[in-house]
Swiss-Prot record:
The lineage of its organism: Eukaryota, Metazoa, Chordata, Craniata, Vertebrata. Pfam families: C2 (PF00168), Copine (PF07002). It comes from Homo sapiens (Human). PANTHER family: COPINE (PTHR10857), COPINE-4 (PTHR10857:SF4). Probable calcium-dependent phospholipid-binding protein that may play a role in calcium-mediated intracellular processes. Interacts (via VWFA domain) with ACTB, BCOR, BICD2, CCDC22, CDC42BPB, CEP162, MYCBP2, NONO, PDCD6, PITPNM2, RDX, SKIL, SKT, SPTBN1, UBE2O and WTAP. This is Copine-4. Belongs to the copine family. SUPFAM superfamilies: C2 domain (Calcium/lipid-binding domain, CaLB), vWA-like.
Length: 557
């Protein structure tokens, strides 16, 4: 057991923090309860210091205000941190007694601490733990941390315009009008936001409704000026100017109340020259509807669980596990590539699964007692309950099953994709964002059931499910790249395309000289968008109710 633990820790300890485009920012609110002071005759002046681990070292991120003589402090200062789903972000909250005459830290001032990951906080939304001091509980003191997404504006707005009595610019027919909307930038430049279709031969056109992100429309500022221009289309590209007007998103939102918002379309030249000029027509906004675009953290904080499943290749091409050249060879202290990949990805996913029970399967081996070939057997040999307790449990089940198997073949992965897809399909019956499935497949060779696998992936693309494939060893994986839709659209043998890209494939050798965290970062970076794409595409909102949200904001530990 000691060797297993060493292998697990060896793989896990290399996980670090990387700089990459931030998915989102999270605000952390902190409160403590029952803080005990070293001096029983007085109350402490507590301050909470947030530290983050990078490359094995802890560094201070920020600290709260000091609350004088208080054993149950609720801090107003918020911690703002960048959130990366694909990384293990280790945090330490330290409570110190800061006396009024100094702001430094002494060992005697330390009242207790708590370590966790940012993933644990956001998945539970409200995390309460006992404070520890030198490995022991610090009396009855505890700390509570609440996470809240500091979101940008990713909402979309749907707009529909029509016009009345536009100027006629054509001699032998009526104008062919279209509308352009420009955002006025801070540097006095203007950015085209949308161009409508052309409505032919019509002075009172009704343009089709369109959607545009609020960020694109006004950079999130409802008071930003918008310039709208109406043109008469000409086939030679020299469109005739009809008129223009300016507005703001704030003004346009008046149409959300069922009212029409309208503007006079003005031609400045006509207005300057013609004494009785009124306008060149009227433009009416008859629809303004905001579509909420929920984020990954909206779903996670709303209670969506990540159901992590692992499938391991036990085909003969891996080599005899008793031989040190085998990809399945168990070194006493150095994890093999299968274990490195498993721990790197599993360490992250486990924070988003409340029960920490992970189904683990094998494929391509003859299994006891009859030693028939199976492509979806439980590596704990309990087909009724293939779940293992934590990533450590998966590691132990993997090492325990190796001597009992006969490595064989072929390398078929469609059965395991279909097995997980069946569970994901049952989840769709709830019509809720309750569970999203991630299947990690670890394989040493090119799969032999490509047609069936393509069919299974196309089917799975309609389900709350993502597939991560890591190729271990030195095989030629060029044919595997076709499963990853980055270079084109994957299709079933019958020609049906995937509904969305759900597969990520990487060869482990690309990360051989990097830490396993780099592998996890590569294969998991797309998962948040895949989760959002699925639920937004289905019109499924986060499960969290307003009552649950309000209760999570309560800081009483």
């Amino acid at each position: 057991m000691k060797k297993m633990s060493n292998i697990y820790e060896s793989a896990a300890n290399t996980l670090g923090i990387f700089n990459s485009p931030c998915l989102t920012k999270v605000e952390l609110r902190v409160a403590c309860k029952g803080i005990s002071d070293r001096d029983a005759l007085s109350k402490p002046d507590p301050c909470v210091i947030l530290k983050m681990q990078s490359h094995g070292q802890w560094f201070e991120v920020d600290r709260t205000e000091v609350i004088r003589t208080c054993i149950n402090p609720v801090y107003s200062k918020l911690f703002t941190v960048d959130f990366y789903f694909e990384e293990v972000q280790r945090l330490r909250f330290e409570v110190h007694d800061i006396s009024s005459n100094h702001n430094g830290l002494k060992e005697a001032d330390f009242l207790g601490g708590m370590e966790c990951t940012l993933g644990q906080i956001v998945s539970q939304r409200k995390l309460s733990k006992s404070l520890l001091k030198h490995g022991n509980t610090a009396g009855k003191s505890s700390i509570t941390v609440i996470a809240e997404e500091l979101s940008g504006n990713d909402d979309y707005v749907e707009l529909a315009f029509n016009a009345r009595k536009l100027d006629d610019k054509d001699f032998f027919s009526k104008s062919d009008p279209f509308l352009e909307i420009f955002r006025m930038n801070d540097d006095a430049t203007q950015q085209l936001v949308h161009r409508t279709e052309v409505v032919m031969n019509n002075l009172s056109p009704a343009w089709k409704s369109f959607k545009v992100s609020v960020n694109s429309l006004c950079s999130g500022d409802p008071d930003r000026r918008l310039k709208c221009i109406v043109w008469d289309w000409d086939s030679n590209g020299k469109h005739d100017f009809i008129g223009e007007f300016t507005s703001t998103f704030k003004e346009m939102r008046g149409a959300m109340e069922g009212k029409q918002v309208q503007w006079e379309c003005i031609n400045p030249k006509y207005k300057a020259k013609k004494k009785n000029y009124k306008n060149s027509g009227t433009v009416i906004l008859n629809l303004c509807k905001i579509h909420k675009m929920h984020s990954f953290l909206d779903y996670i904080m709303g209670g969506c669980q990540i159901q992590f499943t692992v499938a391991i290749d036990f085909t003969a091409s891996n080599g005899d596990p008793r031989n040190s050249c085998s990809l399945h060879y168990i070194h006493p202290y150095q994890p093999n590539e299968y274990l490195k990949a498993l721990v790197a990805v599993g360490e992250i996913c486990q924070d988003y699964d409340s029960d920490k029970m992970f189904p683990a399967f094998g494929f391509g081996a003859r299994i006891p007692p009859e030693y028939t070939v199976s492509h979806d057997f439980a590596i704990n040999f309990n087909e009724d309950n293939p779940e293992c307790a934590g990533i450590q449990g998966v590691v132990e089940a993997y090492q325990s099953c190796l001597p009992k198997l006969q490595l064989y073949g072929p390398t078929n992965i469609a059965p395991i994709i279909q097995k997980v897809a069946k569970s994901a399909s049952e989840e769709t019956n709830t019509k809720e964002a309750s569970q999203y499935f991630i299947l990690l497949i670890l394989t040493d060779g090119v799969i032999t059931d490509m047609a069936d696998t393509r069919e299974a992936i196309v089917h799975a693309s309609h389900l709350p499910m993502s597939v991560i494939i890591v190729g271990v060893g030195n095989a030629d994986f060029s044919d595997m790249q076709m499963l990853d839709g980055d270079d084109g659209i994957l299709r079933s043998p019958k020609g049906e395309p995937v509904l969305r890209d759900i597969v990520q494939f990487v060869p482990f050798r690309n990360f051989k000289h990097a830490s396993p965290a780099a592998l996890a970062k590569s294969v998991l970076a797309e998962v948040p968008n895949q989760v959002v794409d699925y639920y937004n595409g289905k019109g499924i909102k986060p499960k969290c109710s307003s009552e649950m949200y309000e209760s999570s904001r309560t800081l009483a530990p």
